[in-house]
Regions:
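Helix-loop interface residues and adjacent transmembrane-helix termini in multi-pass membrane transporters
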Residues: 50, 76, 101, 123, ...
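Hydrophobic core segments of alpha-helical transmembrane domains in multi-pass membrane transport
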Residues: 25-41, 60-72, 92-93, 112-122, ...
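Active-site cofactor/substrate anionic-group-binding motifs, chiefly glycine-
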Residues: 48-98
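Membrane-helix interface "capping/anchor" motifs
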Residues: 69-83, 209-220, 340-346
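Inter-helical loop and helix-membrane interface segments of multi-pass membrane transporters/permeases
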Residues: 45-53, 93-107, 128-139, 148-208, ...
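Structural signature of hydrophobic alpha-helical transmembrane segments
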Residues: 49-62, 102-116, 164-168, 187-199, ...
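Helix-loop-helix hairpins and the membrane-proximal interhelical loops
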Residues: 1-57, 186-189, 221-308
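Helix-loop-helix junctions within the multi-pass membrane cores of secondary transporters/permeases
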Residues: 2-36, 40, 84-93, 97-143, ...
Length: 384
């Protein structure tokens, strides 16, 4: 594809940018987002919601790649998308907390329906009324609550914190896994004897230092360093790479495995609505914040049209992601890193999308990265 075609397709000159800057911005965005390839496997995979690890990695990479490409080509904005943090954690809790009544296939069906509802709200412009009706304090509360939820899961997965059920308080599957009596006992993990907890501390320290130094891709670099440090500690096992191919096992994919009928039959209306409303507010806030930083909302009417089209792609991406086999796909605030690097057009998002598709070759690495390494990334994201 020649530069002239890219110029016409993305209006590079009109937005004061060039091909080189957009490509660098796309790579920057990918580096800051790529941690989701490994973290999502821990949430939805065999150690989380019970899906095949290869299926989750495939769905994460393809959904992020395809929907980011759509955002870049159809809306021409430098915003990339991928399965969102927070809603993937909620997805896991819905499956694990149901006592076996809600399978991951049914949960995917709920995500698919929420995406269709999101599309309907966007097309009918009801979303504008809904967003305006929610007070800023409630929006902030939702964000903080999701962050604490993610951080708590990260602390538990890493072994830095344990949660025990006190005597007389049993888990009640009929109440979605909520402890009867609404009680649980958090405590510090065993740092002395548990190597995974020690590795999690080291990884968290590396991520914290890199973030303090404003290093782009701090989470991805931290995951890589933690994985290598885990080898002499006996936590990371690279032996699986010897028998693994450099592409996912296509016989274990979850494409089209969602159960929409089951989701509606079980009566997951409250869960579907929660998915929808969190998607709506999260998407709107991220898009307005990133596009404003890119200088694409200066003209009010044009800005409203741009945000509306971007939210439509985001909404369609939710259902597309569920069809592929992953939790809610949403716009990523990490897109701001690419914008800071000069990204102003959809070419940035297209570049990021292509890199996510190319990342399918990294599938075996997702299987060897231990949860003690991905968990600190959850803690960092939750705190932020």
């Amino acid at each position: 594809m020649n530069r002239g075609l890219l110029e016409r397709l993305f209006d590079l000159r009109g937005r004061g940018t060039n091909v080189r800057t957009e490509l660098i911005a796309g790579v920057t965005t990918f580096v800051t987002m790529a941690y989701i390839l490994f973290v999502n496997v821990r949430f939805l995979g065999e150690d989380g919601a019970g899906m095949p690890d290869e299926a989750v990695f495939f769905a994460t990479a393809v959904a992020a790649g395809v929907v980011s490409l759509a955002m870049g080509l159809f809306v021409n904005v430098p915003v990339a998308l991928a399965p969102g943090m927070g809603l993937n954690a909620y997805f896991m809790s819905v499956v694990l907390g149901s006592g076996g009544t809600i399978t991951w296939q049914i949960a995917l069906g709920a995500v698919f329906v929420s995406g269709l509802l999101f599309v309907l709200l966007t097309v009918t412009r009801v979303r504008q009324t809904m967003v305006a009706a929610v007070p800023p304090s409630l929006r902030a509360g939702i964000t903080v609550g999701i962050g604490l939820f993610i951080a708590t899961i990260g602390l538990k997965m890493s072994g830095l914190m344990t949660i025990s059920v006190p005597p007389g308080h049993a888990v009640d599957p009929a109440k979605g896994g909520v402890l009867a009596g609404d009680a649980f006992l958090p405590a510090l993990g065993d740092f002395i004897h548990r190597r995974d907890a020690q590795l999690a501390l080291v990884t968290l320290a590396v991520i914290a230092v890199l973030m303090a130094l404003r290093v782009r891709g701090a989470l991805l670099i931290g995951i890589a360093v933690g994985t290598l440090v885990g080898v002499p500690m006996g936590v990371t096992d690279f032996s699986a790479l010897g028998s693994a191919g450099w592409l996912p096992d296509f016989d274990r994919l979850a494409v089209g495995a969602l159960d929409v009928k089951g989701a509606l039959a079980v009566g997951l209306i409250d869960i579907i609505l929660l998915f929808t409303f969190v998607e709506l507010f999260d998407s709107f806030g991220t898009l307005v914040g990133t596009l404003n930083r890119a200088g694409l909302l200066k003209d009010r009417k044009q800005g409203e049209r741009t945000v509306g089209r971007a939210m439509l792609v985001d909404a369609a991406g939710v259902s597309a992601g569920a069809l592929l086999g992953t939790s809610t796909v949403t716009a990523y605030i990490e897109s701001a890193s690419g914008i800071a690097a000069g990204g102003r057009t959809g070419l940035t998002a297209v570049t990021t999308g292509v890199l996510f598709l190319a990342a399918l070759w990294l599938a075996p690495l997702a299987l060897v990265v231990p949860s003690a390494v991905t968990a600190p990334a959850l803690i960092a994201v939750g705190v932020l």
